[in-house]
Design a protein with these regions (language model features):
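Membrane-embedded alpha-helices of multi-pass transport/permease systems
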Residues: 81-88, 92, 136, 143, ...
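Transmembrane alpha-helix boundary and packing residues in multipass membrane permease domains
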Residues: 46, 50, 54, 87, ...
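Alpha-helical transmembrane segments
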Residues: 37, 41-45, 73-74, 78-93, ...
Length: 307
């Protein structure tokens, strides 16, 4: 993969899906699990809304046990499908990487000797090992989680608009700012991680070549020179990683601040509506919207962090 490659490039995605569809039944099961997790996760705060409005507020404590049992059942189903999703998504990712790595190594074996004279062995090792692990993480932790998160976000938005478009607006006011911050963070992290990958390849290449040619290094008394060269490469590698740390340090506090502002707006407007006897907004809906707002913003942070 080239330095400027995009993990979400359509052509690359189609090529990767060619490997995925070999395990189509596992893929279908993972996709179904992602959909069910989104439904169960969204159902939990809605059950809390029902508990507050239809039982606790009305003093129906005798029937409250049914809501608790339903919430426990929903929680158990969520945990079960999250386990199945995580296991089979990782299994699928490792199977895909296994196939790609075998094909890659066979391809490398077919290269002529002249290619190895021109190419750094360290870079080839980075592509065969590090880049393969990146692809594995795309499937096991990235791609399917992104699909599940997007489904959850769509479901959350639908529930919000269905229950109260007024309270939904208080969330949608903040949403463009968090989307803009997420996009800027995503662009910066993409550049930073490309730089990290490049520096990792340089580091691997340098170490491999010096260890292989250690006799020559010692023969020409270049220990001090090579040590200084290694320090420079290692310093570049450290600076590349520190860029990613810096971007994370900026973005995630901004995301948390946006979430807190959203919760404040929900409590302010929702509480004011309850006091003014607005029949559309109840205490249960306020609790529901607080949880839904967090469910809406959390996937954005995860998407930005992974891609």
């Amino acid at each position: 993969m080239s330095k400027n490659s995009n993990l979400l490039d359509v052509k690359l995605f189609k090529r990767l899906m060619g490997y995925v569809l070999i395990y189509k039944f596992t893929f279908i099961f993972v996709a179904i699990s992602a959909i069910l997790i989104s439904i169960f996760s969204t159902l939990t705060p809605y059950l809390i809304k029902i508990a507050v409005d239809d039982y606790l507020s009305l003093g129906r404590y005798d029937d409250f046990i049914f809501v608790i049992c339903f919430m426990l059942l929903n929680l158990v189903l969520t945990v079960i499908f999250m386990f199945l999703f995580s296991y089979y998504a990782n299994l699928l990712g490792q199977n895909v990487v296994y196939d790609i790595r075998i094909k890659l190594f066979k391809h490398i074996l077919d290269f002529k000797m002249g290619y190895f004279d021109k190419s750094s062995v360290g870079r080839l090792v980075t592509r065969a090992v590090n880049d393969m692990e990146t692809i594995a993480s795309i499937f096991s932790q990235g791609l399917f989680m992104i699909v599940a998160d997007l489904l959850q976000m769509l479901l959350v938005i639908f529930v919000m608009l269905f229950l109260s478009w007024k309270l939904s607006l208080t969330i949608f006011i903040v949403l463009p700012f968090i989307l803009f911050a997420t996009r800027q963070f995503q662009k910066s992290m993409k550049v930073a991680f490309n730089e990290v990958r490049s520096e990792v390849a340089n580091l691997n290449s340098f170490v491999q070549e010096r260890l292989t040619g250690m006799k020559i290094v010692q023969l020409f008394n270049r220990e001090k020179i090579e040590y200084e060269n290694f320090e420079k490469i290692n310093e570049k590698h450290k600076k590349a990683w520190l860029k990613t740390v810096w971007y994370n340090s900026i973005f995630f506090p901004i995301a948390e601040l946006s979430t807190s502002i959203t919760v404040g707006l929900i409590v302010w407007y929702g509480g004011l509506s309850v006091v003014l006897k607005d029949t559309e907004i109840t205490l249960g809906i306020i609790f529901l919207f607080i949880q839904l707002s967090q469910m809406l913003f959390r996937p954005l942070r995860q998407i930005a962090d992974k891609f």
